[in-house]
Amino acid sequence: MNAELRLRLSVGLLSAAVIGYEIGLTRLFSFLQHYHYTFLVVSGAVCGLGLGAALSAAIRQGTEGLGRHLGWWAAFCASSMGLGALLLATFPRMPLLLMVAVAGVPFIAAGAFLALVFRVRHTESQRLYCWDLVGAALGILWIVVALEWLGGVAALISAGMLALAASVLLAERLLARLTMLGLLVVLVVALLVARDGAIDLRALAEAADKPMFRALGSGPDGRSTGEVVDTRWSAFARTDLVDRSGDTGLNLYVDGGAGSYMFRFPGDYRRLFFLRREAAFFPYYFGKRERALIIGPGGGADVLYALMTGWRDIEAVEINPEIVDLVRERGDYNGHLYDLQGVDVHTGDGRNYLQRSDRRYDLIALPLVYAEAADLVGYALAENYLFTRE
């Protein structure tokens, strides 16, 4: 493989790694912090890339000397991605500014790498930019799959492996290649460790600033009050199934918040008679009880309310496919709630579903629209477009 092709491939690989790392960080920050902090990732990425480019301008060498730096900048980017992911997972309650600094180092390295590439090969900037864009596009496709298969932390480490592949392509000496291959082995081991769940949930439980973290906190006797039964990562969110007692049901959380309940349902409605005291049960007593639409059913509590009050046709639209999968996989626990006769569950956005549908409903329920209202007190006066046409 000639040097020009190796350089172009390395640009594509590093671009894929950086965009994938950035998207993965938004998912991790959304879980560790509140969702509005994810916008900080985009600002931090742009800032880091700019700082890296400015840093590269301070390097005063000829074209050949600059070329020798490229592989090491890519290796630095790769190692900082892997190390940063592990630090964020191991110390999830570190100060926010420190968290941003740890997450931002790879962008500085990537900014320096790309600036040096275009400086060394300025006559081929159009071709290199094409490889940059193609790599970024493929990186977006790859990170969606990586998040689902590997999870949030391991997906970030796999981004480091892509960046390391770029550095290996640019390594000219045997010792440099061996060093980078050794770093690759370290990243593979870190990925395997993170694959089983590397985030320190105990530290998050001590913070107790999200519903899920409070559910995992300690009771009066010092024992944990909740246990994570299952975890799913996706490009949409992290979804956790938490067992707090196991007597009446399980809790579902999206990015640590937006909690919903999956009741234990043996098929006998008399066992769930206590639900009639719930305030959310009240609307289902009214109307013709023929066709109901539930937007955001979560673990299926509102589906149960509709069934218990005798509604004939129940349609539910859940935007998070992981929740639907978790409910269906635990059909023996919840009485196969989403597959009962008269219950039709769809995955998608509720507003779009209503726009496409020409049906009319006797009741439209939105149980999870304000699920995090208690945690977002500061946003009580913010605009909300959920009930508008646009």
Describe the function of each predicted region.
Residues 1-390:
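Alpha-helical transmembrane segments of multi-pass membrane proteins
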